[in-house]
Amino acid sequence: MADFGISAGQFVAVVWDKSSPVEALKGLVDKLQALTGNEGRVSVENIKQLLQSAHKESSFDIILSGLVPGSTTLHSAEILAEIARILRPGGCLFLKEPVETAVDNNSKVKTASKLCSALTLSGLVEVKELQREPLTPEEVQSVREHLGHESDNLLFVQITGKKPNFEVGSSRQLKLSITKKSSPSVKPAVDPAAAKLWTLSANDMEDDSMDLIDSDELLDPEDLKKPDPASLRAASCGEGKKRKACKNCTCGLAEELEKEKSREQMSSQPKSACGNCYLGDAFRCASCPYLGMPAFKPGEKVLLSDSNLHDA
């Protein structure tokens, strides 16, 4: 039997299930107790009672699961998470489980790669496969009896994983070196070489070796033509029987319609023969119907009574 790196004074847990032979379990525990000595401790846990045992976090240095000779133990995600919880930071898990060599999504038995992924998802690091070995006829029979699974593609795989050197959810204050900001009055030093690189003097403008681009040469004759206002209008601007400018019109149609509206208002204003009726009685004719009425604005609507009309 491998010693799994167990030394004196360490706390070790052995996880077993109903498929584990009693004599084999007792023999394994005796060998482990000899390695841990009086200062260490070896705990034996049934896999179905592990979640109910309520061990404190970081209770064990090493956990051996499914390693009792003759065991055919399967590990669920909950069991693996509990094992990771009760392992001490830096502690190791050694696990043995029957796996399928062919992928079968309907099988309760995982493949070796899926088992390694499950260990990683439980929070363990440095997960690696140690060895593979075929099942004996007795172990095949045990898988059939205890797991209700029958397959010709089974083998045992032994995997190890390590808990990180910190507790899940632990925190630590970071020491940040914050430098004091320089005073606003202190200006940063200017690199003379950089300043010279970005400086363009008048002498440079007269240098024939300087290749300066005339911006006017970048324009085509078409660019210099004044555009026709009609060409700037949107395709749908002013369509329909009633011309109407778009909202936030920029093509000039709104101003054009406003001018047309002003001309219509001016043409619709009433005109008198003399054109002075609105100025007051001093400017009105003798026969003006507005005699006696105060001055009014041009185009203002004025109502005449029947008596005024008869007098006129």
Curated annotation (Swiss-Prot):
Organism in which the protein naturally occurs: Homo sapiens (Human)
Phylogenetic lineage: Eukaryota, Metazoa, Chordata, Craniata, Vertebrata
Annotated segments matching region Fe-S binding site A: 237-251
Summary of the function given for this chain in its UniProt record: Component of the cytosolic iron-sulfur (Fe-S) protein assembly (CIA) machinery required for the maturation of extramitochondrial Fe-S proteins. Part of an electron transfer chain functioning in an early step of cytosolic Fe-S biogenesis, facilitating the de novo assembly of a [4Fe-4S] cluster on the scaffold complex NUBP1-NUBP2. Electrons are transferred to CIAPIN1 from NADPH via the FAD- and FMN-containing protein NDOR1.
InterPro entries recorded: Anamorsin, Anamorsin_N_metazoan, CIAPIN1, SAM-dependent_MTases_sf
Broad class of the protein's primary localization: cytoplasm
Any one GO cellular component localisation term in the record: nucleoplasm
Binding positions for [4Fe-4S] cluster per the UniProt entry: 274, 277, 285, 288
Expressed in which tissues: Ubiquitously expressed. Highly expressed in heart, liver and pancreas.
Key word 4Fe-4S present: yes
Entry protein name: Anamorsin
Chain positions of motif Cx2C motif 2: 285-288
A single MF term (Gene Ontology): 2 iron, 2 sulfur cluster binding
UniProt motif (Cx2C motif 1) ranges: 274-277
Similarity comment: family membership: Belongs to the anamorsin family.
